[in-house]
Amino acid sequence: MTHHDAQPSTDAEQSSNATLPHILICNDDGIEADGIHALATAMKKVGRVTVVAPAEPHSAMSHAMTLGRPLRIKEYQKNGRFFGYTVSGTPVDCIKVALSHILTEKPDILVSGINYGSNTATNTLYSGTVAAALEGAIQGITSLAFSLATYENADFTYATKFARKLTKKVLAEGLPADTILSVNIPNVPESQIAGVIIAEQGSSRWEEQAIERHDMFGNPYYWLSGSLQLMDHSMKKDEFAVRHNYVAVTPISCDLTNYAALAGLEKWKLKK
């Protein structure tokens, strides 16, 4: 695969856009998801866009990478026009392949999403959308992840407007090293948005269910399911804020160290 950058529709458009920021877009719902098409359309008003996304949905893949089998890159068209590239792997694979074999230089910013369903609380750990942004941060790229708090009847109107506005702000202000913004947006009209909160990652978690079924030979198999249980009741926490129609903007770090626990553990005086 030869290297490519964003492909505007004409040479004139490419020339006029050459000084605009270059935006790499990814997701975990796959390149056919409505969310990434809405995001790409919005980001084209901010800069030059390159879309590199999984060929198929890879939700809840977290920071998984593909090892032991090849990855394949293909150009993807929407309505007869070039839209982006598919990678036969995970969201993190997409970022790695984009930087090594699709783009000729690092993008100015990486924007992941728009995800179906919130990525708050412990969902942050499972999310391929967030992981793509974290991989961007690991690679030294300013990165954002956007999620819409619904799995059905998604309305991306306000989400894309806010994503565009925040992306411009981050391009102007920057972010601390190894830090992304995970942005969770209620699925309501703009008139019902209560505001924007700089929120902490909450503690809400899934109450798991493994539903047992049987195949034609009588062998059991299982579908993982469950429901997210609200464990925080503070507007400072992401899931609680989103449920009250606030946009939750949460800074997430690549560093998973629990610094508050270090002093106590040092008192254990562990020896070899």
UniProtKB/Swiss-Prot annotation:
EC number: 3.1.3.5
Cofactor(s) needed for function: a divalent metal cation
Species, as recorded: Chlorobium chlorochromatii (strain CaD3)
GO molecular function: 3'-nucleotidase activity; 5'-nucleotidase activity; exopolyphosphatase activity; metal ion binding; nucleotide binding
First-listed, main subcellular location of the protein, grouped into a coarse class: cytoplasm
Catalytic activity: a ribonucleoside 5'-phosphate + H2O = a ribonucleoside + phosphate
EC class of the enzyme, as a word: hydrolase
Claim: Cytoplasm is one of the keywords in the record: yes
Protein name: 5'-nucleotidase SurE
HAMAP family assigned: SurE
Family statement: Belongs to the SurE nucleotidase family.
Function, as annotated: Nucleotidase that shows phosphatase activity on nucleoside 5'-monophosphates.
Gene Ontology cellular component annotations, sorted alphabetically: cytoplasm
Signal peptide: none
Sequence positions that bind a divalent metal cation: D28, D29, S59, N115
Entry annotated with the keyword Hydrolase: yes
Localization of this protein: Cytoplasm
Keyword set, alphabetical order: Cytoplasm, Hydrolase, Metal-binding, Nucleotide-binding
Entry's cofactor comment: Binds 1 divalent metal cation per subunit.
